[in-house]
Amino acid sequence: MATGPYDKSERVELADEAVHWDLGASLSYGEYLQLDKLLAAQRPLSSEHNEMLFIIVHQVSELWMRLMLHELTAALACVRQDDLGPALKMLARISRTQTQLITVWDVLSTMTPFEYSAFRSALGRSSGFQSLQYRLLEFLFGNKNADMVAVHQRDPQAYETLKRALESPSLYDEVLRLLSRRGYEIPADYLTRDFSQPYRASKQVAGAWLGVYHNADKGWDLYELAERLVDLDHNFQLWRAHHLKTVERIIGYKAGTGGTGGVSYLAKALELKFFPELWQIRTSM
C-alpha cells in the first residue's frame, strides 16, 4: 500500500543513536551553563505579568554586552600587537552581536504603556543609564565622558573599572596608533593625548583614512578594518534609534526612571559617532 506524508512516524527514533543517557560524573547541559542560577535571576518586584518581559529583555541585553566586551577587549589587544587577522574576526562577531541587541527592542515593544505603568514604580530609580557594561562599551568605542563614572560611586570595583576604561586608549585610539605605525600621518598629539577626554575629529586623520581607501590594494587589512569600524558605528546608531522609538512608544515623553529626560535625552545621542572621520570622508571619495 502506498504511503503518504501523513503515514510517517511522528517522532525521531533514537534506537540507532549513541545517546548518553547516563552522564555519570560528566557535566550536564544545565550544569555547564549554570541554568539553575541563570533562570533563578528573574525576580519581579510586582505581581504584574509583564514585568517578567521587562527583566528578561534587559538581562539578555546585558549578556550580549558581556560577549561584546569579551570580544572587544581581545580585539584591542590584537590591534596593539599589529595582529589584525583575529581582530577583524572579533569585530565582525561584535557586529553580529549588535544585531541581536537591536532586535531585542522589537520584543520589548510588545509592551503597552498601560502594561509598563502597572509596575514602573517598582523600578525606583534604577535605569539602563546605570548599566556598567553599556558605559564600558561606550568608553572602549571612544565616547568618553568623565561625568558618567560618578553614577557608579556606590560600587568601588565598578567605579575603578570604569575609571580605567575612561583613562585608557579606546579602540579608535589604538587604531590610529596602528595607522601611524603603518606609515600614515597621524598628528603626534593625537597619539599621546589625554584619553579621558572626548575625541575630536581631525583633517589629518581624515586624510590618513582617505589614503587607506585609495591604497586598498596595498593594505587590504586596513581597508577592511575601516569598514568593520563603520559597521560597528552604524549598528550602534541603529541600536540608539530603536531604543529611542521603543521608549517613545512605551512612555511617551515622560522622564526616565534614572532622572534623564527620557526621549529628549536619548535624541541627543542619535548623531554621536565613534569614528567621525570614517563618515566625513565618504563625501569626498
Where are these regions (language model features)?
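Surface-exposed peri-terminal alpha-helical interaction modules
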Residues: 2-285
